[in-house]
Amino acid sequence: MDYILNTLSNLIAQTAFMNLTFGNLIMIFVAFIFLYLAIKKGFEPLLLVPIAFGMLLVNIYPDIMLRPENSANGVGGLLHYFYVLDEWSILPSLIFMGVGAQTDFGPLIANPKSFLLGAAAQFGIYAAYFIAIFMGFNDKAAAAISIIGGADGPTSIFLAGKLGQTEYLGPIAVAAYSYMALVPIIQPPIMKFFTTDEEKRIKMEQLRPVSQLEKILFPIIVTVVVCLILPTTAPLVGMLMLGNLFKESGVVKQLTETAANAMMYIVVILLGTSVGATTSAEAFLKVTTLKIVALGLIAFAFGTLAGVIFGKVMCKVTGGKVNPLIGSAGVSAVPMAARVSQKVGAEYDPTNFLLMHAMGPNVAGVIGTAVAAGTFMAIFGIV
């Protein structure tokens, strides 16, 4: 009888109920909210579902992220090994390859001035960097946090890992992906407030056709130029352009399909669940997390505003040929930010089609955010 009671007692002690803290319950509730937003509201489900599920798992069973050195048998938790690929910057780089294989840089090639709008939208990153330092973060932490302003989750994870700021990786990644999902909510008020009705109704000239040769040369030239100037961007820009070269060369269809689909989605699963698993209650429920979330919002809002303001400048310089609404697409949330530009413009003139014009700054923003990350790495001597 004692054996049975002891066995039952041990079984009960091993259940998660006996080890749950109030903080764990809060994070489980947050995971449920993310799942609701992803499944019911359709907010970036490919990202939020794995992130939310990783968050759920780690707060029910923390040892799923156990490091091997802390394990009795020397074997770590499952998601720890996924997370190691984040720390080594492997998964973010592979995500960029997949994005490159899915992306058409034609609108950017047809209108190179879009590069300027993509660059302007990176202002939010540098503004957030100095604000973060003012709030008490060290320079490397400030740099890792500020990249959230580009609305680019993989780059945020990449830079946090490279700068050794893994303690902030969970909040940074969750904030970055959350703001990517909330682009349709955050950007429109800024776009509407800082542009006139007349500017919103500006119709832009149709983009010129882009030849296949131009599309093939573009990833090669960008890789050579950017990586010669900032070699630290090679893992991101190099993989982005390699994926795009797969797509545009037309001779490696199997590689294109694999990079854009099978590999991309496998990496999203690994990246999402491992990022979610960094949000244990002990690591996430801190005042620092609130600061990071606030800084991310400031950075993203500043980036959107800078893009719109520079769009207004280009509108004046070109004699009203540029609709300032496409400036907000300079953040690297592809293609959500471009769709928002189209949606806001259509509210004022249903016959105004800005999507392809907005895609230029949007894809330029992907390159711009990677360059910003590479700049920080160069400043801190990280290779």
Regions found by a protein language model. Give the residues of each.
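N-terminal alpha-helical transmembrane segments of multi-pass membrane transport
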Residues: 1-74
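Intrinsically disordered, low-complexity non-transmembrane regions of multi-pass membrane transporters
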Residues: 1-19, 25, 75, 189-218, ...
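Hydrophobic transmembrane alpha-helices of secondary-active transporters
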Residues: 34, 57, 85-109, 243-246, ...
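Alpha-helical membrane segments and immediately flanking helix-loop junctions
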Residues: 88, 96-103, 117-127, 131, ...
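Entry/N-cap segments of selected transmembrane alpha helices
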Residues: 107-129, 280-307, 358-362
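Alpha-helical transmembrane segments
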Residues: 167-185, 295-303, 326-329
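Membrane-embedded hairpin module used as a gating/binding unit in multi-pass transport
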Residues: 175-251
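Transmembrane helical segments that form the transport core of multi-pass membrane transport proteins
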Residues: 223-307
